Amino acid sequence: MTITYIHHSGYLLETDQALLLFDFAEGTLPPLDPAKDLFVFVSHRREDHFSPKIFDLAATHPRIRFILSDDIWQNKVPEHLHGLSWFMDPGNVLEWKEGGGLRVTAFKSTDEGVAFMVETGGYTIYHAGDLNNWRWNGEELAWNNNMSTNYRRELEKIKASGFHPDVAMVPLDGRQEDLFYLGLDDFMRIVGAEMVFPMHFWEDFSVIPALKKLDCSAEYRDRVADIRKDGQRFCFPAFPDNRSGGETT
């Protein structure tokens, strides 16, 4: 499987039979193999995660399906694509036979929309959307504590569901200042993943080496992808001599 970081929270994953496009709102999309089924995921309606331009892909990729958070208004979807679009609430599970078989489970965000857990081609893939430990300096302590409680509760639900992702895409947001690492750290400690790909860092790639320097990341830092630019492409499983990245381009 290949993983391409597009921009912000946008990722393209390619398996032998399917293309999985997550939260593509900005950036340059890599070439898409027309012989493969394309599944387009949108975690919520905010413009840094959702752009109506995704629907233009149907013109050049007829084997397409849209899996959208239920907070996205249905009138945002062109009428001729209604039959190719599904809306998910937290707790929903959807399955397709196409693309080698695909099963999607939605979890509740601590902000808007949903997080996605996708099982396909022998892989388990997690995209957090805005499910994160959104603690902020200057916010009331009770609000922050409630945020952490809700986030960890949702992670425990994921763990209790038996999921252990091969690949996880999780926010690492420098706007949280010294609290930037909390959500990803919680995720790796409670759920875990074979490889974790940071996202939602607003072009501040420095948060990735900053995370790896923290003592708390000692147990998993070699499983954090070294993303340095938009369009960077990785392999999973990663090359044995470069597990922390597996970069191909």
Where are these regions (language model features)?
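Short catalytic-loop micro-motif centered on adjacent basic/acidic residues
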Residues: 41, 103-106, 168-171, 196-198
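Glycine-rich, phosphate-binding/catalytic loops in enzymes
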Residues: 39-40, 56-60, 143-146, 185-188, ...
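Binuclear metal-ion centers of metallo-dependent hydrolases, dominated by the metallo-beta-lactamase
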Residues: 4-8, 77-97, 181-249
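Active-site environment of divalent metal-dependent phosphoester hydrolases
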Residues: 27-30, 46-50, 72-76, 93-95, ...
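Core dinuclear metal-dependent hydrolase active-site scaffold
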Residues: 1-35, 85-164, 229-249
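A short, acidic, amphipathic alpha-helical segment used as a generic capping/interface helix at domain edges
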Residues: 152-158, 177-186
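Generic beta-sheet signal
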Residues: 67-69, 107, 128, 198-199, ...
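Active-site metal-binding motif and surrounding structural segment of the metallo-beta-lactamase
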Residues: 26-74, 159-169
